[in-house]
Amino acid sequence: MPLIFKIGYNVIPLQDVILPTPSSKVLKYLIQSGKLIPSLKDLITSRDKYKPIFISHLGFNQRRIFQTNGNLKTITKGSRLSSIIAFSTQANVLSEVADEGIFETVYGKFHIMIESIEIVEVEKLKEEVEKHMNDNIRVRFVSPTLLSSKVLLPPSLSERYKKIHAGYSTLPSVGLIVAYAYNVYCNLIGKKEVEVRAFKFGILSNALSRIIGYDLHPVTVAIGEDSKGNLRKARGVMGWIEFDIPDERLKRRALNYLLTSSYLGIGRSRGIGFGEIRLEFRKIEEKEG
């Protein structure tokens, strides 16, 4: 079974800077230019939509920085920002991980320091699953999350509606969330041709789950620029949804996949910071349901 590496960084601008859109481009630029963990460059440039890498938006005061209204975000010199890179690779990346350094980028000059390193054996996530079999699952969307409901189309219909742009769900179902997590997990372990299984798993999870509560809201966010320099925008979801899956086998699988996505994210554009999630758990009360 593969390993997941999660590295937390402190990112301090050494001058006033205007952050790029999205702000994750600062660390992405350093990787692509070979200045930070160069072994990840091929993973970043891969066209695989479920590739095992997540680069968060920069954070300030425990909130992710992303652009919603077209206004650029200016950060003052000396501000302490945070970021996370999570990934899985066969390369010997630990030899490339430096504790700190000062880096020139096209966005300004930054002092970058490692705050934390976590290495997770995917197989051992099953131990964490068992701890939460009697809990409700709360999925919190830390950054705007882009989930296409077309993931729940039967595979026999996927090609027919391939060119229909329905946007992203701003009220995602349990099945949609866990189907995306399943796809991330399968890509991580090298399991191929999973479209039928993902569809069945999503439909079953919708049918056999119960929603305990939610606080979800849509957000329109800039995801980058087109070839003419115009902002590209998408409408995603933030907030949280809490649910339980009474069927033990199904819940065990859902927890396993969601725990993986708590490192690698879910949905579209995870490689530039969208779809960051955090799992929270609450004991099931007898009166629920």
Swiss-Prot record:
One of its GO terms (molecular function) is RNA binding. One of its GO terms (biological process) is defense response to virus. It is an enzyme of class 3 (hydrolase). The keyword Magnesium applies. Gene3D superfamilies: 2.40.30.310, 3.30.70.1900. It holds the Pfam family CRISPR_Cas6. The keyword Nuclease applies. InterPro entries: Cas6_N_arch, CRISPR-assoc_Cas6_C, CRISPR-assoc_prot_Cas6. Its cofactor is Mg(2+). Keywords: Antiviral defense, Endonuclease, Hydrolase, Magnesium, Nuclease, RNA-binding. Its EC number is 3.1.-.-. NCBIfam families: cas_cas6. Possibly part of the aCascade ribonucleoprotein complex. Belongs to the CRISPR-associated endoribonuclease Cas6 family. CRISPR (clustered regularly interspaced short palindromic repeat) is an adaptive immune system that provides protection against mobile genetic elements (viruses, transposable elements and conjugative plasmids). CRISPR clusters contain sequences complementary to antecedent mobile elements and target invading nucleic acids. CRISPR clusters are transcribed and processed into CRISPR RNA (crRNA). Functions as a ssRNA-specific endoribonuclease, generating an 8 base-long tag known as the 5' handle. This is CRISPR-associated endoribonuclease Cas6 2.
